[in-house]
Amino acid sequence: VLLKNNGDGTFTNVAEETGTTFNSLAWGAVFLDADNDTLLDLYVSGGYDGSIGSFLSAAFYHQQNDETFVIPQNIGFENDTRKSFSNAIGDINNDGKPDIIVCNDTENNFLWENKTTNTNNWLKVKLEGVTTNRDGIGNTIEIFINGRSQYRYTLAGEGYISQNSYHEFFGLGEATEVDYVKVTWTGTNTEDIIYDVNANQSITIKEGNGVLTSDDIQTNTLLSLYPNPSNDGVFKLSVNNNKSNTLKVYDLAGRLIFKIKNLKDK
């Protein structure tokens, strides 16, 4: 069963027409963008070991551009032949590609490391609540790229005996920048919005403060100005090379407040 939200408070079972019928005993399921192409894929754990007829032990469904799914061959799951009860996603090597941990019925759980080799980009977002709970559970994250939104809802348990990473994964495809990231804090009905977020980084957004940490800001900055904030003084920047430079100004919370692209010989 795959229940598609119709947007009016009702759902429709689209498992057969989308190719996600799981002819076995399903225990745990998780959506993930395994190849960061912006389309969510699906992994399902099963209660059989694959030795009984055509009953699947598990299945990975790769989403196509027409909202259908296929089970690809020779991508590493051929030995996924254990009875399992749950699964969860995280990023064991911080490369931006979601990995899968599977809880099997006996010892020796499976850890499936994502070896995708494409050049698609990604963004990871972690929340830190202040008025709401510290882990940011129960809130909505929206990113917007190329006229299209993606959403994640932070949870404290995605399935039976399973918990995903607190980092929410977004596949960006070929996009190198996210137009904006918006967090809606359910408990207070407030929003934090940050604009022009670079791809291929992990950021933490603190309730009411915007970006708390940003790998991109910390590691790719040529200079910092102090005191910050300040309201007096003039800073002059000279660019005398042929490279295309970008000037970005952030406040102490990591929020982008000013940006100029394509600085050359200025």
Identify the residue ranges that each predicted region occupies:
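Gly/Ser/Thr/Pro-enriched helix-cap/hinge segments flanking short amphipathic alpha-helices
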Residues: G50-G53, T68-N220
